[in-house]
């Protein structure tokens, strides 16, 4: 996948102008191939920037985690910089965990926007267990329509877009070449296994324990699996798990990319109380408790 050149960027901008001034449809395939290519390349390059810091032999990992010179802060900022520069040429504004959070009065009229977490999984990063991710999503009218999750330490890429399906592939960390994609859910991922719930084995909230107890009544052989950061949503999208209850606080940038991938894989991400789909670019950027299934 090639990084956008000037002509391609011009084409994207022209599409957006035509869409605003005519009946020209921005959803033609070449337009969205361009967009997905943009965010995949942004995620890959941001992941490389993170790994340069993660593997740096001279950094002090004892520094306070959010100090300006901590590895976490350096990686977060560098990833954000790479992504912001890549998305600057697109027609849409950016809402990022690391960037400035604009007041709702400025955001409420945004028809489409990027929602980004440049380094999701701070605990995983600090523990050096490799389960941190780069998350980029395109949200239109509150719905995630395109998303990319890159796991740079494991060289694994996930992406999905509305109407086009969801996929995963391995990435060459040296060249950033994306290997042969596999469609999600993975063929045979649910064959011959027990019903699986994504949850922390060691830090279950009382509400999650109750939720799992209720599930056991219907699935006595229930099995729990765990993963870091947005990889929890990917497990359900892959078909390696059946349900992920998140009965604890999260922010929109924690879930937007995974939500897009889950939707493209035929899954649902629902408010645990109302059973309605999660929405984005809300006045309050906190998510309600939710369930992925």
Q: Over which residues does each language-model region extend?
A:
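Acidic beta-strand-loop-alpha-helix segment within the catalytic core
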Residues: 137-233, 282-293
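N-terminal subdomain of lithium-sensitive/metallo-dependent phosphomonoesterases centered on the IMPase/IPPase/PAP
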Residues: 31-119, 175, 190, 210-213, ...
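Residue-level signal for inorganic ion chemistry
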Residues: 50, 76, 87, 122, ...
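Glycine-rich active-site/cofactor-binding loop and its immediate structural neighborhood
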Residues: 112-142, 146
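Oxyanion/phosphate-interacting regions
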Residues: 9-10, 28-47, 209-218, 225, ...
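Extreme N-terminal basic, low-complexity initiation segments
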Residues: 2-10
């Amino acid at each position: 996948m090639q990084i956008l050149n000037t002509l391609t960027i011009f084409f994207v901008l022209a599409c957006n102008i035509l869409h605003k001034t005519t009946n020209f449809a921005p959803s033609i395939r070449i337009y969205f191939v361009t967009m997905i290519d943009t965010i995949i390349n942004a995620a890959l390059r941001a992941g490389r920037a993170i790994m340069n810091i993660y593997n740096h032999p001279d950094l002090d990992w004892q520094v306070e985690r959010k100090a300006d010179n901590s590895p976490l802060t350096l990686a977060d900022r560098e990833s954000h910089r790479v992504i912001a520069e890549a998305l600057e040429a697109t027609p849409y504004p950016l809402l990022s965990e690391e960037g400035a959070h604009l007041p709702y009065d400025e955001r409420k009229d945004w028809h489409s926007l990027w929602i980004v977490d440049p380094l999701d999984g701070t605990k995983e990063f600090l523990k050096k267990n490799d389960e941190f991710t780069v998350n980029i999503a395109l949200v239109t009218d509150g719905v995630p329509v395109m998303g990319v999750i890159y796991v740079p330490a494991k060289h694994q890429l996930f992406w999905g877009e509305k109407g086009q399906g969801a996929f995963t592939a391995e990435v060459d960390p040296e060249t950033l070449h994306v290997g042969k994609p596999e469609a999600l859910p993975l063929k045979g991922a649910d064959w011959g296994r027990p019903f699986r719930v994504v949850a922390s084995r060691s830090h279950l909230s009382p509400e999650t324990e109750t939720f799992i107890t209720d599930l056991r009544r219907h699935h006595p052989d229930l099995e729990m699996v765990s993963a870091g950061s947005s990889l929890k949503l990917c497990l359900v999208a892959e078909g390696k798990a059946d349900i992920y209850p998140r009965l604890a606080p999260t922010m929109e940038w924690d879930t937007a990319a995974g939500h897009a991938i889950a939707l493209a894989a035929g899954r649902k991400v629902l408010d645990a109380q109302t059973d309605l789909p999660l929405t984005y670019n809300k006045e309050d950027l906190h998510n309600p408790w939710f369930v992925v299934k």
